[in-house]
Amino acid sequence: MSFRLSSGSRRLCSPAGSGQLTGGRTGFRAGNACGGLGAGSSFSGPLGSVSSRGSFSHGGGGLGSGVCTGFLENEHGLLPGNEKVTLQNLNDRLASYLDHVCTLEEANADLEQKIKGWYEKYGPGSGRQLAYDCSKYFSVTEDLKRQIISVTTCNASIALQNENARLTADDFRLKYENELALNQSVEADINGLHRVMEELTLCTSDLEIQCEALSEELTCLKKNHQEEMKVMQGAAGGNVNVEINAAPGVDLTVLLNNMRAEYEDLAEQNREDAEAWFNEKSTSLHQQISDDAGAATAARNELMELKRNLQTLEIELQSLMAMKHSYECSLAETESNYCHQLQQIQEQIGATEDQLQQIRMETEGQKLEHERLLDVKIFLEKEIEMYCKLIDGEGRKSKSTYCKSEGRGPKNSENQVKDSKEEAVVKTVVGELDQLGSVLSLRVHSVEEKSSKISNITMEQRLPSKVPQ
């Protein structure tokens, strides 16, 4: 089973295959730094890299500019230090999760190997099949497995949709917070520009006041000059002629014109200096504002990309944890099923062992019964042999008696011959059996008939009853 991780998608693909994490070009991308999850199950990024062996190495992928570094390192920037710790914790958790997945895969492979060995030993293809046939339940179990897998997949998809909705809401919240921070920074810049404008207005008002003072002074000088001219004209209108050899008088018009030109040059110089100072300050301030705005935009874009990658990784981690939980549930269910099957097999083995023990005991009982019957047979054969010997002995005795009585006379010899001819021996063996077929007792009846005289000889031998099994 393969899991494909991509930075542009929050979906989880799980086609059938090997249990190895593969992915395209995903990771924390900042500037020219990028990373991915490849065939070696490793994760790399500008903040560090994680491999499937659980090691964490700090990578050196740059963030593009010194301004971004300032935002990351400054505690008052847009990316505080706790998010670095969060990313490092996520990398560590991903590494430990990959180790746990490898351990579970090894345990699953071990269980599958044991199950395969058990099927090779007791399966349909082997000669040692179990007495109980479970093949009729295979279709039901397969149907239940398919239903469980479909329900588990549906639950995982619903959980993934819920997580996507929550992450979308978090995206909008973060976007709102970023826009609010940007608005506040712009308002702060506007307030700073307002203060600069107020300073420039105060400077302009001071210059206007100085210009008004100079204009008033010029007006006063003009007024004094006119009064002096009137006085001089009134004095020149009399009859007194006074000739004085004096130095030539000062030309007030030229003096005033020179003073006016000097003050105008001074005012123009002050105005040019103020305008140059204002332009210089405005240019540097505008340049600083544009630089700060560009740096803030770049840092904001970088931060948004990092947050987007973080959210993607969190979604993938949640999906992997859900899949891991489903695999653990399936493994526990499989273990419980096989434990139940093993318990049933052990019960069948115990029942078979009990049956074998009972058969063994019955065999022992039948063996004892056979030995007992064999003893009875031997005893009966001995009795028969003894009776045969007795009969043979009585026959010889009767013959000897016949030979002795032969010379006594014809009458006695005729009677003896008649008696010997009429002599007969009848033996009857009567046995008692119980319900199991065991011999309880034997009776042997011997009947001798000699010329209408019957003698009954009864032998009885009691045998012990069969020992109950």
From Swiss-Prot:
It holds the Pfam family Filament. Residues 395-465 are annotated as: Tail. Residues 83-398 form the IF rod domain. Residues 233-255 are annotated as: Linker 12. The keyword Transmembrane does not apply. GO terms for cellular component: cytoskeleton; intermediate filament. GO terms for biological process: epithelial cell differentiation; intermediate filament organization. Keywords: Coiled coil, Intermediate filament, Keratin. GO terms for molecular function: structural molecule activity. Residues 398-421, 450-469 are annotated as: Disordered. Residues 256-394 are annotated as: Coil 2. Residues 141-232 are annotated as: Coil 1B. Residues 1-82 are annotated as: Head. Coiled coil: none annotated. Residues 405-421 have a biased composition (Basic and acidic residues). It comes from the Eukaryota. Residues 119-140 are annotated as: Linker 1. Residues 83-118 are annotated as: Coil 1A. InterPro entries: IF_rod_dom, Keratin_I. Heterotetramer of two type I and two type II keratins. There are two types of cytoskeletal and microfibrillar keratin: I (acidic; 40-55 kDa) and II (neutral to basic; 56-70 kDa). Belongs to the intermediate filament family. This is Keratin, type I cytoskeletal 26. It comes from Bos taurus. The lineage of its organism: Eukaryota, Metazoa, Chordata, Craniata, Vertebrata. The gene is KRT26.
